[in-house]
Design a protein with these regions (language model features):
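Early extracytoplasmic/lumenal segment of secretory-pathway proteins
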Residues: 33-111
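Periplasmic-binding protein-like
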Residues: 126-130, 225-233, 271-294
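Mature extracytoplasmic/periplasmic domains
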Residues: 293-362
Length: 390
């Protein structure tokens, strides 16, 4: 959905692609975490390609520019179903009609825990190698109990965006959107999704350490209550709860002057007044990965697709089309245009992404490793969200 799609087309397309999209960079490795999941064997060898592969994907991930060449090379016809939300992706994958999904972190754990996807044999995916950026390997959202379930596609941070005409001094903290005395009260943009609760948790991790939050997606009942209380206070200062199709106009129209955003949306304003920063407290973010259905009807074509789209050239095409950092860092060396894109999205800057907690599905087994308490689930977050907005 980018390169760079005109507004409002870009924002509308982005809405389909990221509404609910992919968590954890900072401290969110799956190392040592054990969660009970269905025992599904992974493929040991590849066979002959089937005639097709059926894919559920965000808009912009499966396009003729690269899908047609894949079909010519493999004989696998690509059948695409565009999904608008992670919830829709989960529902579609549970029908058994699709082989692959471009899952985000707020969907992937649901698919893994419920046995909807199978672990992957990365030896059968040659392009899943050293060129895949380290920060997109072994993360909670697609790796569990030592098994890889997802082949990374791309990532991005939820940055703090601001209008330099109004916010004259570059902010370095999320305090400008959370504290009651913010000079920008009434002009603050907030993301309209239950997963935004994690943004409040990130701020509380830094400002109220006594709450004991170690992972913004692992909140017990009291920690969730604290995050919801902060969100309710913020509600009094919010100008708009945005989705990707309204974010750009909220800023360009002057309704909002500061708030959470995505780098691709900032660029979509085509206005240098709007700048961004990754605040000192860190941030949430999103990351997407290909996942294979537990009972895929076309697994060989699916493996071929995962390998093909993990090459530097094709992964880079997807990243530029969508507006995100590519998973294959080798893309950044292919051309001046590729390098510029990678620089814009901090593609290979692991120090940058070490401060980002990529979206992950909150589940009752605490993702921070605690055993003495039950954590809140995404259903709990979904139930709490309407109380925030009033």
């Amino acid at each position: 959905m980018k390169k760079y799609l005109a507004i409002p087309a870009a924002a509308a397309a982005l809405g389909l692609a990221l509404a609910g999209c992919s968590t954890g960079g900072t401290g969110a490795s799956s190392d040592g975490l054990q969660i009970d999941v269905p025992d599904i064997p992974k493929m040991e060898t590849l066979g002959d390609n089937e005639k097709q592969v059926n894919i559920v994907a965000w808009s912009g991930f499966v396009e003729p520019a690269w899908a047609d060449k894949f079909t010519a090379e493999t004989g696998c016809t690509v059948n695409r179903k565009v999904a608008a939300t992670s919830d829709e992706m989960v529902q579609l994958m549970r029908t058994g009609e699709y082989d692959l999904v471009s899952a985000s972190g707020d969907a992937s754990l649901r698919l893994i825990v419920d046995g909807n996807v199978q672990p992957l044999n990365t030896d059968l995916i040659p392009n899943f190698g050293d060129d895949i950026v380290e920060g997109m390997k072994g993360q909670l959202y697609d790796t569990l109990n030592g098994n890889v379930y997802g082949i990374p596609i791309g990532r991005g941070a939820n940055i703090l965006q601001y209008n330099t005409d109004v916010v004259s001094e570059k902010p370095n903290s999320w305090s400008v959107v959370w504290e009651k005395d913010s000079p920008y009260a009434g002009k603050i943009a907030a993301y309209d999704s239950p997963i935004y609760i994690a943004d409040a948790a990130v701020y509380l991790m830094a400002t109220q350490p006594e709450l004991g939050i170690k992972n913004p997606y692992a909140l017990d009942k009291d920690q969730l209550a604290a995050a919801v209380d902060l969100l309710k206070e913020q509600n009094k200062m919010v100008s708009e709860y945005w989705n990707p199709s309204t974010n750009v106009t909220s800023f360009t129209g002057g309704n909002s002057v500061v708030g959470t955003s995505w780098e691709v949306l900032r660029k979509a304003t085509q206005d240098e007044r709007f700048q961004s920063v990754l605040p000192k407290e860190g941030a949430t973010g999103w990351s997407d990965a290909w996942m294979l259905a537990a009972e895929a009807k076309n697994p060989n074509c699916a493996y071929a697709w995962m390998d093909y789209t993990s090459s530097p050239q094709v992964n880079g095409q997807i990243a530029m089309n969508f507006g995100m950092a590519p998973a294959n860092g080798a893309f950044c060396d292919l051309s001046a245009e590729a390098k510029a894109h990678c620089d814009d999205y901090s593609a290979t800057d692991e120090d940058y992404y070490s401060k980002v907690w990529f979206w992950t599905t909150p589940i009752e087994p605490c993702l921070d490793g605690r055993k003495d308490v039950k954590c809140t689930s995404y259903q709990d977050w979904t139930a709490a969200w309407p109380t925030v907005k009033g």
